[in-house]
A protein has these predicted regions:
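A short acidic Gly-Thr/Ser loop motif
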Residues: 22-24, 146-153, 159-162, 171-175, ...
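A conserved active-site cap/scaffold subdomain adjacent to cofactor or substrate pockets
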Residues: 171-187
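Residue-level signature of catalytic and energy-coupling elements of molecular machines
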Residues: 1, 20, 113, 148, ...
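Conserved phosphate-binding/catalytic loops in two-lobed NTP-binding clefts
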Residues: 46, 50, 279-300
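Short, solvent-exposed amphipathic alpha-helical segments in soluble enzyme
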Residues: 114, 139, 275-281
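Nucleotide/phosphate-binding catalytic cleft detector across ATP-hydrolyzing
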Residues: 1-145, 163-165, 174, 188, ...
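Glycine-rich phosphate-binding loops at beta-strand->alpha-helix junctions
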Residues: 22, 200-203, 255-279
Length: 300
Protein backbone atom coordinates (compact mmCIF):
# COMPACT_ATOMS: atom_id res chain seq x y z
CA UNK A 1 0.00 0.00 0.00
CA UNK A 2 2.92 2.36 0.62
CA UNK A 3 3.97 1.93 -3.02
CA UNK A 4 0.45 2.78 -4.19
CA UNK A 5 0.43 5.89 -2.02
CA UNK A 6 3.78 7.01 -3.44
CA UNK A 7 2.51 6.48 -6.99
CA UNK A 8 -0.69 8.39 -6.27
CA UNK A 9 1.38 11.22 -4.84
CA UNK A 10 3.62 11.28 -7.91
CA UNK A 11 0.72 11.04 -10.39
CA UNK A 12 -1.51 13.34 -8.36
CA UNK A 13 -4.37 10.91 -8.99
CA UNK A 14 -6.02 8.02 -7.21
CA UNK A 15 -5.34 4.44 -8.32
CA UNK A 16 -8.40 2.22 -8.37
CA UNK A 17 -6.95 -0.87 -10.04
CA UNK A 18 -3.49 -2.18 -10.91
CA UNK A 19 -1.96 -4.36 -13.61
CA UNK A 20 0.28 -7.07 -12.19
CA UNK A 21 3.23 -8.43 -14.16
CA UNK A 22 4.04 -12.14 -13.91
CA UNK A 23 7.53 -13.38 -14.74
CA UNK A 24 10.32 -15.42 -13.22
CA UNK A 25 11.17 -19.08 -13.04
CA UNK A 26 7.58 -20.32 -12.77
CA UNK A 27 6.88 -19.36 -16.40
CA UNK A 28 7.30 -21.83 -19.26
CA UNK A 29 5.51 -22.91 -22.41
CA UNK A 30 3.98 -26.20 -23.50
CA UNK A 31 2.45 -27.17 -26.82
CA UNK A 32 -0.98 -28.65 -27.39
CA UNK A 33 -3.00 -29.74 -30.41
CA UNK A 34 -6.79 -29.80 -30.62
CA UNK A 35 -8.50 -31.75 -33.42
CA UNK A 36 -11.99 -31.58 -34.91
CA UNK A 37 -13.36 -34.13 -37.40
CA UNK A 38 -16.35 -32.69 -39.26
CA UNK A 39 -19.18 -34.83 -40.61
CA UNK A 40 -18.87 -33.29 -44.06
CA UNK A 41 -16.74 -30.74 -45.84
CA UNK A 42 -17.73 -27.28 -44.69
CA UNK A 43 -16.21 -23.85 -44.45
CA UNK A 44 -14.21 -23.30 -41.27
CA UNK A 45 -16.02 -20.75 -39.12
CA UNK A 46 -14.79 -18.40 -36.42
CA UNK A 47 -17.07 -20.27 -34.00
CA UNK A 48 -15.13 -23.47 -34.70
CA UNK A 49 -11.81 -21.69 -34.11
CA UNK A 50 -13.16 -20.30 -30.84
CA UNK A 51 -14.24 -23.81 -29.85
CA UNK A 52 -10.72 -25.13 -30.44
CA UNK A 53 -9.34 -22.29 -28.33
CA UNK A 54 -11.78 -23.05 -25.51
CA UNK A 55 -10.91 -26.76 -25.58
CA UNK A 56 -7.22 -25.92 -25.43
CA UNK A 57 -7.70 -23.72 -22.36
CA UNK A 58 -9.62 -26.50 -20.62
CA UNK A 59 -6.75 -28.98 -20.87
CA UNK A 60 -5.92 -30.01 -17.27
CA UNK A 61 -2.32 -29.45 -16.16
CA UNK A 62 -1.45 -30.59 -12.65
CA UNK A 63 -0.63 -27.67 -10.32
CA UNK A 64 -0.32 -25.29 -13.29
CA UNK A 65 -2.47 -22.51 -14.74
CA UNK A 66 -2.64 -21.51 -18.40
CA UNK A 67 -1.98 -17.77 -18.28
CA UNK A 68 -1.90 -16.96 -22.00
CA UNK A 69 -2.31 -18.80 -25.29
CA UNK A 70 -0.40 -18.13 -28.51
CA UNK A 71 -2.14 -19.84 -31.46
CA UNK A 72 0.61 -21.22 -33.72
CA UNK A 73 -1.19 -22.36 -36.84
CA UNK A 74 -4.12 -24.46 -38.02
CA UNK A 75 -3.70 -27.54 -40.19
CA UNK A 76 -6.43 -27.79 -42.80
CA UNK A 77 -5.85 -30.71 -45.15
CA UNK A 78 -2.13 -30.57 -45.88
CA UNK A 79 -1.90 -26.81 -45.42
CA UNK A 80 -0.77 -24.88 -42.34
CA UNK A 81 -2.68 -21.60 -42.05
CA UNK A 82 -2.58 -18.71 -39.61
CA UNK A 83 -6.24 -17.90 -40.31
CA UNK A 84 -8.29 -20.77 -41.77
CA UNK A 85 -11.71 -19.06 -41.50
CA UNK A 86 -13.62 -19.59 -44.74
CA UNK A 87 -11.49 -22.51 -45.95
CA UNK A 88 -13.54 -25.66 -46.79
CA UNK A 89 -12.47 -28.86 -45.00
CA UNK A 90 -13.76 -31.88 -43.07
CA UNK A 91 -10.82 -31.84 -40.63
CA UNK A 92 -8.90 -29.20 -38.71
CA UNK A 93 -6.06 -29.22 -36.19
CA UNK A 94 -5.39 -26.24 -33.96
CA UNK A 95 -1.84 -25.95 -32.66
CA UNK A 96 -1.32 -23.83 -29.57
CA UNK A 97 1.53 -22.64 -27.38
CA UNK A 98 0.35 -22.30 -23.79
CA UNK A 99 2.19 -20.08 -21.32
CA UNK A 100 1.82 -21.72 -17.94
CA UNK A 101 2.88 -21.08 -14.34
CA UNK A 102 2.42 -22.76 -10.99
CA UNK A 103 -1.12 -22.28 -9.69
CA UNK A 104 0.28 -20.92 -6.44
CA UNK A 105 1.74 -17.90 -8.26
CA UNK A 106 -1.61 -16.24 -9.01
CA UNK A 107 -3.09 -17.48 -5.74
CA UNK A 108 -0.35 -15.80 -3.71
CA UNK A 109 -0.61 -12.58 -5.73
CA UNK A 110 -4.39 -12.50 -5.33
CA UNK A 111 -4.04 -13.02 -1.59
CA UNK A 112 -1.47 -10.25 -1.17
CA UNK A 113 -3.46 -7.66 -3.11
CA UNK A 114 -6.73 -8.65 -1.44
CA UNK A 115 -5.16 -8.16 1.98
CA UNK A 116 -3.85 -4.78 0.85
CA UNK A 117 -7.31 -3.79 -0.40
CA UNK A 118 -6.08 -3.25 -3.97
CA UNK A 119 -8.11 -4.48 -6.94
CA UNK A 120 -6.26 -6.23 -9.78
CA UNK A 121 -7.35 -5.02 -13.23
CA UNK A 122 -5.53 -7.77 -15.11
CA UNK A 123 -2.38 -9.84 -15.24
CA UNK A 124 0.40 -9.08 -17.71
CA UNK A 125 3.00 -11.64 -18.75
CA UNK A 126 6.18 -9.63 -18.29
CA UNK A 127 8.17 -11.15 -21.21
CA UNK A 128 5.28 -10.37 -23.58
CA UNK A 129 5.10 -6.77 -22.37
CA UNK A 130 8.86 -6.46 -22.84
CA UNK A 131 8.60 -7.82 -26.38
CA UNK A 132 5.94 -5.24 -27.20
CA UNK A 133 8.31 -2.54 -25.99
CA UNK A 134 11.55 -3.52 -27.72
CA UNK A 135 10.80 -5.61 -30.82
CA UNK A 136 9.94 -4.14 -34.19
CA UNK A 137 7.24 -5.64 -36.41
CA UNK A 138 9.95 -6.58 -38.89
CA UNK A 139 11.92 -8.49 -36.24
CA UNK A 140 8.85 -10.41 -35.09
CA UNK A 141 7.93 -11.25 -38.66
CA UNK A 142 11.42 -12.24 -39.85
CA UNK A 143 12.16 -14.28 -36.74
CA UNK A 144 14.15 -13.26 -33.68
CA UNK A 145 14.94 -14.15 -30.13
CA UNK A 146 14.57 -11.70 -27.28
CA UNK A 147 16.97 -12.21 -24.37
CA UNK A 148 16.31 -10.44 -21.08
CA UNK A 149 19.39 -10.68 -18.83
CA UNK A 150 18.05 -10.03 -15.36
CA UNK A 151 19.69 -10.25 -11.96
CA UNK A 152 18.48 -13.73 -11.02
CA UNK A 153 17.04 -15.06 -14.27
CA UNK A 154 17.50 -14.84 -18.03
CA UNK A 155 14.31 -15.00 -20.09
CA UNK A 156 14.35 -16.32 -23.66
CA UNK A 157 11.49 -15.56 -26.08
CA UNK A 158 11.39 -16.69 -29.71
CA UNK A 159 9.23 -15.02 -32.37
CA UNK A 160 8.57 -15.96 -36.00
CA UNK A 161 5.87 -14.68 -38.37
CA UNK A 162 4.61 -12.32 -35.65
CA UNK A 163 3.88 -15.26 -33.33
CA UNK A 164 5.48 -16.25 -30.03
CA UNK A 165 7.03 -19.67 -30.66
CA UNK A 166 8.89 -20.41 -27.42
CA UNK A 167 9.42 -18.95 -23.97
CA UNK A 168 11.73 -20.17 -21.21
CA UNK A 169 13.25 -18.73 -18.04
CA UNK A 170 16.80 -19.75 -17.14
CA UNK A 171 17.66 -19.55 -13.41
CA UNK A 172 20.91 -17.69 -14.04
CA UNK A 173 21.60 -13.97 -14.29
CA UNK A 174 23.84 -11.08 -13.38
CA UNK A 175 23.77 -11.81 -9.66
CA UNK A 176 25.48 -15.14 -10.32
CA UNK A 177 28.45 -13.25 -11.72
CA UNK A 178 28.53 -11.10 -8.60
CA UNK A 179 28.42 -14.18 -6.36
CA UNK A 180 31.30 -15.73 -8.30
CA UNK A 181 33.39 -12.64 -7.63
CA UNK A 182 32.36 -12.81 -3.95
CA UNK A 183 33.98 -16.26 -3.80
CA UNK A 184 37.34 -14.46 -3.92
CA UNK A 185 36.74 -13.15 -0.39
CA UNK A 186 35.18 -9.92 -1.65
CA UNK A 187 32.07 -8.37 -0.13
CA UNK A 188 28.94 -8.38 -2.30
CA UNK A 189 28.71 -4.61 -2.67
CA UNK A 190 32.34 -4.41 -3.78
CA UNK A 191 31.94 -7.42 -6.08
CA UNK A 192 28.99 -5.74 -7.80
CA UNK A 193 31.03 -2.57 -8.30
CA UNK A 194 33.97 -4.54 -9.71
CA UNK A 195 31.63 -6.32 -12.11
CA UNK A 196 30.01 -3.12 -13.34
CA UNK A 197 33.25 -1.18 -13.62
CA UNK A 198 35.62 -3.79 -15.01
CA UNK A 199 33.52 -6.79 -16.05
CA UNK A 200 34.10 -7.94 -19.62
CA UNK A 201 31.79 -10.47 -21.26
CA UNK A 202 34.25 -11.30 -24.03
CA UNK A 203 38.04 -11.07 -24.20
CA UNK A 204 39.26 -11.11 -27.79
CA UNK A 205 42.36 -13.34 -27.81
CA UNK A 206 43.54 -11.84 -31.10
CA UNK A 207 43.90 -8.35 -29.64
CA UNK A 208 46.96 -7.26 -27.70
CA UNK A 209 45.62 -5.07 -24.94
CA UNK A 210 47.62 -3.26 -22.32
CA UNK A 211 47.84 -5.56 -19.33
CA UNK A 212 46.47 -4.42 -16.01
CA UNK A 213 47.83 -6.43 -13.06
CA UNK A 214 44.93 -5.66 -10.71
CA UNK A 215 41.50 -4.08 -10.65
CA UNK A 216 40.70 -2.04 -7.53
CA UNK A 217 37.91 0.17 -6.22
CA UNK A 218 38.68 3.14 -4.01
CA UNK A 219 41.42 1.28 -2.22
CA UNK A 220 38.83 -0.96 -0.53
CA UNK A 221 39.66 -4.16 -2.36
CA UNK A 222 41.41 -5.46 -5.43
CA UNK A 223 41.46 -8.56 -7.59
CA UNK A 224 43.89 -9.82 -10.20
CA UNK A 225 42.73 -8.60 -13.58
CA UNK A 226 43.01 -11.95 -15.35
CA UNK A 227 41.09 -13.65 -12.53
CA UNK A 228 38.17 -11.21 -12.73
CA UNK A 229 38.11 -11.55 -16.51
CA UNK A 230 38.07 -15.35 -16.28
CA UNK A 231 35.27 -15.33 -13.68
CA UNK A 232 33.01 -12.99 -15.65
CA UNK A 233 33.62 -14.58 -19.05
CA UNK A 234 33.10 -18.11 -17.72
CA UNK A 235 29.72 -17.31 -16.19
CA UNK A 236 28.59 -15.35 -19.27
CA UNK A 237 29.54 -18.32 -21.44
CA UNK A 238 27.49 -20.64 -19.23
CA UNK A 239 24.44 -18.38 -19.46
CA UNK A 240 24.78 -18.03 -23.23
CA UNK A 241 25.16 -21.80 -23.63
CA UNK A 242 21.86 -22.24 -21.79
CA UNK A 243 20.26 -19.53 -23.94
CA UNK A 244 21.38 -21.22 -27.14
CA UNK A 245 20.15 -24.58 -25.88
CA UNK A 246 16.67 -23.07 -25.48
CA UNK A 247 16.83 -21.71 -29.02
CA UNK A 248 17.71 -25.16 -30.35
CA UNK A 249 14.90 -26.72 -28.30
CA UNK A 250 12.47 -24.25 -29.86
CA UNK A 251 13.25 -25.64 -33.31
CA UNK A 252 13.82 -22.15 -34.71
CA UNK A 253 17.61 -21.86 -34.40
CA UNK A 254 18.02 -21.70 -38.20
CA UNK A 255 14.96 -19.53 -38.86
CA UNK A 256 15.74 -16.32 -36.96
CA UNK A 257 16.62 -13.92 -39.77
CA UNK A 258 16.49 -10.85 -37.50
CA UNK A 259 18.91 -12.44 -35.04
CA UNK A 260 18.97 -11.63 -31.33
CA UNK A 261 17.72 -8.62 -29.40
CA UNK A 262 19.38 -8.37 -26.00
CA UNK A 263 18.20 -6.30 -23.04
CA UNK A 264 18.24 -6.30 -19.24
CA UNK A 265 20.61 -4.99 -16.60
CA UNK A 266 23.21 -7.75 -17.00
CA UNK A 267 23.35 -7.03 -20.74
CA UNK A 268 25.24 -3.82 -19.93
CA UNK A 269 28.49 -5.72 -19.40
CA UNK A 270 31.29 -4.61 -21.69
CA UNK A 271 31.45 -6.54 -24.99
CA UNK A 272 28.18 -8.42 -24.36
CA UNK A 273 27.24 -7.98 -28.00
CA UNK A 274 30.52 -9.56 -29.11
CA UNK A 275 30.10 -12.38 -26.60
CA UNK A 276 26.66 -13.16 -27.96
CA UNK A 277 27.87 -13.15 -31.56
CA UNK A 278 30.76 -15.46 -30.75
CA UNK A 279 28.90 -17.89 -28.49
CA UNK A 280 25.83 -18.36 -30.69
CA UNK A 281 25.37 -18.96 -34.39
CA UNK A 282 23.50 -15.72 -35.03
CA UNK A 283 25.13 -12.98 -37.08
CA UNK A 284 22.75 -10.19 -36.07
CA UNK A 285 22.72 -8.93 -32.49
CA UNK A 286 20.96 -5.75 -31.37
CA UNK A 287 21.34 -4.32 -27.88
CA UNK A 288 18.06 -2.77 -26.70
CA UNK A 289 18.32 -0.50 -23.68
CA UNK A 290 16.12 1.80 -21.61
CA UNK A 291 12.84 0.55 -23.04
CA UNK A 292 9.54 1.18 -21.29
CA UNK A 293 7.05 -1.65 -21.03
CA UNK A 294 3.75 -1.55 -22.88
CA UNK A 295 0.48 -3.25 -21.98
CA UNK A 296 -0.66 -3.80 -25.55
CA UNK A 297 -0.79 -7.46 -26.52
CA UNK A 298 -0.57 -9.82 -29.42
CA UNK A 299 -1.85 -12.85 -27.55
CA UNK A 300 -5.42 -14.12 -27.35
Amino acid sequence: TSIIKKLESTLKASIGKVYVGIGGQSLRTIRNTEVRHLEEETKISQELIDSLMDSNREVPIIDQDILEVAPQEYKVGINLLADPVGVPSDHIEGRFLNIIARSSVKQNIDKCFHQAGIEIADYVISPLALANAVLTNSERRSGCMLIDFGADTTTVSVYKNNILRHLAVIPLGGSNITKDICSQQIEEEDAEELKLKYGNAYIDPSKDEEETPNYAIDGKCSIEAHLLEDIVEARVNEILANVWNQIVLSGYDDKLLAGAIVTGGAANLKNMEEAFSKRTKLEKVRMAKDSQLSLKGGIE
